[in-house]
Amino acid sequence: MALEEISERLQVSDFPTLGMAANYDLRRHKFESLANDGSHEMRADVRRWVGNPSDFGGCNPINGHIIALTMPMIKPDRVKIAGYIYECWFLYSWDLTTTLTGADGFFHDDILEGTNEGVSDTDAFGLGTADQDAKARDGRKQIQAKMMYLLETTDKACAKHLQKVWSNMLVTTIQHKSRDFETLKEYIDFRIRDCGALFGEGVMLFGMGLALTEKDREDVASTIYPCYAALGLTNDYFSFDREWEEAKRTGEAKFSNAVRLFMDWQSTGAAAAKEVVRKAIIEYEREFLELREKFVKANPKAERLHKFLEAMVYQISGHVVWSINCPRYNPSFRYDPNSGVENQVLAERRGKSSSKKPSVMIEEIDEKSHLASETGPAMIA
């Protein structure tokens, strides 16, 4: 599939990014409606099996769903699954970073248990086993079973990798969510494992049907490091206000965020600390583009890794553009998160509403790709 068939090119300069992602390519998936569908199917499952989810996830009816903006290269028939999995992570990760318990924290008890006991193949994401409420416990298990079914019946190898990343992130966050750090480098090394950059990468690789070997990861490790750093700091920059308000509400003095750390390190206010983080983000973004260019020139035959690094470029630009006005971080853009209005707004944003269902459009693109493979080299998205 040609990239132009499944995504549209955007200009970073059209968005108020404050200098972030300034020299980055930006695209948005044409099958964004499926990402919205996946998010709301996940939320409907939580309502049915656990309780009413009040937090916001990946939807952004103004700039675009996080899957559409950060993963424009994934296969159309995997967009909805990616939306479902990512929405679960959003609900789950908020429990990782707050002190919510009981009905407000859908996965809180299971996170604690997962830290103590690890995550097994039969309890792939650590959901449900610790909850004392039978309905909630069984509901979380239902969600977990559904996620594993969706992943493994689509791509078993990528599913296994994603499960491993989730498990590692769970343990890292619970053990270190309030720890102190002495240097930015020390914090970034932690944040790479904690902030979801590796999880987002795992969802992206699943969506692309791209499996990396251990050697692949070793070969690209130094190149991709500043990309992970930029992603972690971008998350901190845009989520700080939300986390700061939550910390004041709960009395939690410490939380893992680079802005909060610079406030302590430099004895400064939030605005000045955010400016330091913004400049660090821009520097890591610049470094990643330079290292990526050097890697491609030095490894002209490593086409799989070229594709991976290209996809990670969109992770950076997409996260910045999504974060600017996503309801998850920005109270002024909030609405009923369970209303399901995003696809209606999406149609209005694009100025048209196709009469074709997404499934029909996917079949048409697959047919074009099949014909292309019979007549010449296949186009790889």
UniProtKB/Swiss-Prot annotation:
Signal peptide per UniProt: none
SUPFAM superfamilies associated with the record: Terpenoid synthases (SSF48576)
Keywords: Lyase
Domain of life the protein comes from: Eukaryota
InterPro entries the record matches: Isoprenoid_synthase_dom_sf (IPR008949)
The protein's annotated pathway: Mycotoxin biosynthesis
Single GO term (MF): lyase activity
EC class (word): lyase
UniProt similarity note: Belongs to the terpene synthase family.
Entry function: Terpene cyclase; part of the core atranone cluster (CAC) which products are predicted to catalyze most or all steps of mycotoxin atranone synthesis, starting from geranylgeranyl pyrophosphate (GGPP). The initial cyclization of GGPP to dolabellane is probably performed by the terpene cyclase ATR13. The Baeyer-Villiger oxidation near the end of the atranone synthesis, which converts atranones D and E to atranones F and G is predicted to be catalyzed by the monooxygenase ATR8. Of the CAC's other predicted gene products, the reducing PKS ATR6 might synthesize a polyketide chain.
The protein's name in its UniProt record: Terpene cyclase ATR13
The organism's taxonomic lineage, starting at the top: Eukaryota, Fungi, Dikarya, Ascomycota, Pezizomycotina
